[in-house]
């Protein structure tokens, strides 16, 4: 089962083509740091993502393949606190 770390509308992009989400929506905001690999989106439409920047309460990230996400670290993590 997939747990979404960062609820987001994956159709919402900035002028640089990065996706945007609110940091306050993250399951564990302290885990959302530049370079972090997360699952973003919704249960019906999600993606592996890499966080690029945090600014004024917003998270800027790009979607990546599972292969690229796995190169950055384990894709298996403990259950989130909200599970």
Task: Annotate each predicted stretch with a short phrase.
Residues 1-21:
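Short, basic/aromatic beta-hairpin or loop at an interaction surface
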Residues 14, 42, 54:
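Acidic surface patches and DE-rich sequence motifs
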Residues 25-27:
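Short, solvent-exposed loop/turn positions at domain surfaces
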Residues 30-33:
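Short, well-ordered loop/turn sites that connect or cap secondary structure elements
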Residues 37, 41-47:
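Short, charged beta-turn/beta-strand-edge "cap" motif at the junction between a beta-strand
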Residues 45-56:
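Short beta-strand-centered aromatic/proline hotspots
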Residues 55-83:
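Glycine- and charge-enriched low-complexity intrinsically disordered segments
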